Amino acid sequence: SNLVRLNLPYPMKLSWEKQTIIRSILVHPCLKKQLENVLFSVKENYSADQIENLGLNLFGGTYNYRQMRGGSEWSRHSWAIAIDFDPERNQLKWGKQKALIDNPEYDKFRDAMRANGFISLGELYNYDWMHFEASYELLYGLKY
């Protein structure tokens, strides 16, 4: 495997099994530093209670070798170049009217994601607000 372990700056919970605490995740090496920057930014800009209430500690996954839901192309998760946050409250087909991550409380989080080379499918297409994936610039070392 070419994946690397990222030690989390704050504990996260599996979104589908909230009693399970995780302290590290597997990611593609090209995005480890930038995702680490994002998570440290979350820790610096939000209190522990805010992180919990906003679901920024609810890990929806990075590496999952599978095709995209309803499609034949491989998911970005197949290469561990994407991460999902709080899938229960930011569901795949929900638009910004329902998804929480579009709310102003998440501005610093979304800003940190963009500043570190991650793309929000919610911001691009108004669905799958939980999902943030590495930009081409980040993947190919053109920036960051």
Residue ranges of predicted features:
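Active-site-adjacent loop/helix surface patches within enzyme catalytic domains
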Residues: 39-81
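Active-site acidic/histidine clusters and adjacent loop/turn architecture
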Residues: 1-55
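Generic intrinsically disordered, low-complexity segments enriched for polar/acidic and small residues
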Residues: 7, 13, 43, 60-62, ...
